[in-house]
Amino acid sequence: MSINTDETTWQTFKRLWQFIRLYKSGLIVAVIALVINAISDTYMISLLKPLLDEGFGNADSDFLRTLPLIIFVMMFIRGTSGFVSTYCLSWVSGNVVMLVRRMVFNHFMHMPVSYFDKEKTGNLLSRITYDSEQVSAATSQALVSIVREGASIIGLLVLMFYNSWQLSLVLFAVAPVVAWGIGVVSKRFRKISKNMQTMMGNVTASAEQMLKGHKVVLSYGGQDIERQRFDKVSNQMRQQSMKLVTAQAAANPIIQMIASFAIVAVLYLASIDSIKEQLTPGTFTVVFSAMFGLMRPLKALTNVTSQFQRGMAASQTLFALIDLEPEKNEGKYTVERAKGDVSVKDVSFTYVGSEKPALEHVSFDIPRGKTVALVGRSGSGKSTIANLFNRFYDVDSGSITLDGRDIRDYELKNLREQFALVSQNVHLFNDTIANNIAYATEDKYERSDIEHAAKLAHAMEFINKMENGLDTMIGENGASLSGGQRQRVAIARALLRDAPVLILDEATSALDTESERAIQAALDELQKDKTVLVIAHRLSTIEKADEILVVDDGAIIERGNHADLIAKNGAYAQLHRIQFGE
């Protein structure tokens, strides 16, 4: 599932235009204001001809007396049009960036788990933050310059040809060379911009890795290692930025040097007698000033090329990401509440990028209302089985059925509503305890339901000691709670969901013995009318399971209840002796 970034600038801009055109009212107003702004500049230059030919040459002329008023009016128009264009394009740009950013965020939420397994979190964050912000460069600053400077160039050219087409023809010799130069610079800018996106992703990933592992860094004295790692990626980002600045700084004088040949040629032609006879001081000054005035928009267009190409490179990356295939959801079958009969039939599965299967020909049944426990050493494939139930991954062969129907036939959201998962890796949101327990179902349950679930999970024991109780903000990933408290909140969330199938993946691993016993009693009560899959290292928590499966190296090597497996004196009995020191 790789990102395709082979689109041309034009193809990318056409896709971006589909977003821009949604706010065409603001765009139209901005373009009109920009054109007015450019016309005002051109008109100011055109005033040089009557000023020189009539103003100073005719003592009775009223032109000099009206000129201050004309200049005041033109500056007012110029200032007003500049404000309107900047505001409107910023409004358009802000909405486009917000829309693209939302699309990327929403697409991330529908990507398969396998995609996130191989992508750096920092790189993905950079797509939402840095890359989407770069789109603004192509929809505001760049568009302002392109329209305004483009209109200025057209206006100045019209002014030049109107006053002296002979002198103005010089531009036809220079224009192709200038266009070629801008084209070369654009390609360079885009290449560097893509590299900058990659480097920014690395910077974000390095910072995110340190922040998430801050306690480990402090505990092991890893500050120097992390500093060196961050210094390296930061310097790489700086180098790419300097390449962009160098290209931009070199492009300006080169383009202006090429354009200066036109000015030199005009001065030479103006000295030829046959042409000089047709020129008035005002005409020559207007043509020369207009040609010299072309330098500013040419410089601005060269500068804006880097902004535009940054925006195009970012847009290309974001569109390529949006084009990635989301997780498959081809099932149509839905059920309000499943009965809970689960069957795993000859399932094999291999993670992407791995040559060794994680599961091989695994089969077992969990009848409705029964509890099946999976035990075994770490990496044996226990959690993989739980992940397949929710279709975080799809089986390579075999099938998993719920109430006799393949889980791939279920509509994905409806399927996941039938399972409540408590993982060993608890994730809580930066919100209140109540909202974490009722996550994604805030409008479905009453406050009393949330409190009841918290009591069953023995979470109210510590919640009642907090000043704001269930309304306490717990910080990012429950930073203000202990490991055991976080796990009890996660258990309360699963209890509130009241799904027909309960998956407990090391659900009590972070609890002390007393809390574990209390919660186990609540779970025993809860499991009476539910199908339960328990993954456990602590064998004391699964002794009452209807069936225990011993998993090793992706295969089931033993099965039976606790008493039967102890009597067999096999792998389970050995694990039991190790844990209980028998």
Swiss-Prot record:
Catalytic activity: ATP + H2O + lipid A-core oligosaccharideSide 1 = ADP + phosphate + lipid A-core oligosaccharideSide 2
Disulfide bonds: none
Localization of this protein: Cell inner membrane
Entry binding sites for ATP: G376, R377, S378, G379, S380, G381, K382, S383
Cellular component aspect of the GO annotation: plasma membrane
Main localization, broad class: membrane
Pfam family of the protein (one): ABC_tran
InterPro entries (alphabetical): AAA+_ATPase, ABC1_TM_dom, ABC1_TM_sf, ABC_transporter-like_ATP-bd, ABC_transporter-like_CS, ABC_transpr_lipidA, P-loop_NTPase, Type_1_exporter
Residue intervals of the ABC transmembrane type-1 domain: 28-310
Membrane spanning stretches: 27-47, 69-89, 142-162, 165-185, 249-269
EC number(s) on file: 7.5.2.6
Domain ABC transporter: residue ranges: 342-578
Keyword Membrane: yes
Subunit description: Homodimer.
UniProt similarity note: Belongs to the ABC transporter superfamily. Lipid exporter (TC 3.A.1.106) family.
Protein name stated in the entry: ATP-dependent lipid A-core flippase
